[in-house]
């Protein structure tokens, strides 16, 4: 079944619910009358709700309408491409060196236009110290404030604590000429206080 918009003589129904060029509701009229009104206004009769009974048609400039629809579709695709979510996983007792490394990855992701989900992973008795996670997330949010903002505040998620950071508008454009892709930094990063993934001491 074709989804192409029907215009003018391609609208083959006996009557339509007509909307005028200014958005005014004209009412149900014969198709011949609707076509005549559109022609007198040097505009097009466009079927905007074909599944209604009777179909809804609007008098408009169809060329301009097609252009606006295409613009909205492009904007929608652009927005979808910008909703990539990266993830950084940290332990609540992270040392300063590893924190700076992870922070730099978060900054790069934000500059690239990606959102970042930051997850604090608690183990064992660490679960009784949620304030450690809150402090770490608050610190990170403040440290990257020039590159993004806290979209979803810190919250407990089972044994973990999460926060979502979003880039400032235009971040990807500003950063494209300054930074290449982060070498070796994937979508998920997991470190503990020593920089090891298993929590064992050096």
Swiss-Prot record:
Keyword field contains Protein biosynthesis: yes
InterPro entries xref list: T_IF-3_C_sf, T_IF-3_N_sf, Translation_initiation_fac3_CS, Translation_initiation_fac_3, Translation_initiation_fac_3_C, Translation_initiation_fac_3_N
Subcellular location: Cytoplasm
Keyword vocabulary terms for this entry: Cytoplasm, Initiation factor, Protein biosynthesis
Pfam families from the UniProt entry: IF3_C, IF3_N
Highest taxon, organism lineage: Bacteria
Region Disordered: start-end pairs: 172-202
Transmembrane segments: none
GO biological process: one example: ribosome disassembly
Main location: cytoplasm
GO molecular function list: ribosome binding; translation initiation factor activity
PROSITE patterns: IF3
One GO cellular component, as annotated: cytosol
Oligomeric form and interacting partners: Monomer.
Record's function text: IF-3 binds to the 30S ribosomal subunit and shifts the equilibrium between 70S ribosomes and their 50S and 30S subunits in favor of the free subunits, thus enhancing the availability of 30S subunits on which protein synthesis initiation begins.
Entry-linked NCBIfam families: infC
Protein family membership: Belongs to the IF-3 family.
Protein name: Translation initiation factor IF-3
